[in-house]
Amino acid sequence: YNFSFYDNHDVLIWDLMKNKIKIDYVFNLCDEGFNNEARKELHVPALLEMLKIHYSGSGPQCLAYCYDKSLVRGIAKEMDIPVADGIYIKQEDMSFTFLPFNFPVLVKPNFGDSSFGITQKSVVKDMEELISVISELRSEFGYEYPLLIEEFLIGADISVGIIGNPPESYKVLPIIEEDYSELPKDLPKICGYEAKWLPTSPYWKIKSIPLNLPEETNNFIIESCLKLFRRLECRDYCRFDWRLDSNNNPKLLEVNPNPGWCWDGHLVKMAKLEGISYSNIIEEILKATENRIGLFQNNI
């Protein structure tokens, strides 16, 4: 492959327009959003759509769906795919005095990715802590958008990766779980902001390991991921996060159609378990894109 890197967002639109005739397709590595604004993650594929340039990965509508966690929850429930019990809290809402499910609960931003706003403090055990954490998200993190409050699940913390485009041609990568065995026992078992971005945190010791599930549970999770992949219009690759409850029942947490590209990201970890290197996983995604757009069949 011969690549040209377009990483200057100030002139990105002009560069794409100027060089459009030379571009077979774009490998979209922009997982932090246009101008590094997370809410503008969908703007890059939207721009490519308007310029009629083919690109890898999901389209703007899919990215918009999945950026809204409550919307994904609603779609999953409509499809009879279980999700954690939860409620949606609007920006101005601090008047609630009870929850329709038991503590402990997990508080997280409804919009966003990269575990922004999800820390050890996000797992709370009573109403007083809950109100305090919500206030902190509003003030210290500057998060002014709706929140989700979900039951805190204590079972295996699971990730599933798919490369390709079901139902025609796809690969389900080995399922992994987070290994919390080295985490101090007084800390909640979550893979949040500290685990991904703070090397000095005890959460940095979390590892991802292969997960062996009962066949029925394994098949249900994979089938549900494939259904969601198609329903949400994911393309070429995607990651799905699940967690088991205390009875080992799987519950969908989130769908990430544009997971991070760092060398130690979850998609890369899954691929390594199947002997797929970092460069090979990129090649497989490129091949999935080429097959989808008919690059060679139609001489595009």
For each feature predicted by the language model, list its residue ranges.
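Conserved metal-phosphate-binding beta-hairpin within the catalytic cores
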Residues: 151, 160-162, 229-262, 271
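Short, flexible active-site recognition loops that position polar ligands and cofactors
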Residues: 267-279
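Peripheral (often C-terminal) accessory segments that flank ATP-dependent C-N-forming ligase machineries
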Residues: 95, 203-216, 231-237, 244-247, ...
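Phosphate-binding site of ATP-dependent enzymes
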Residues: 127-216, 220-223, 246-251
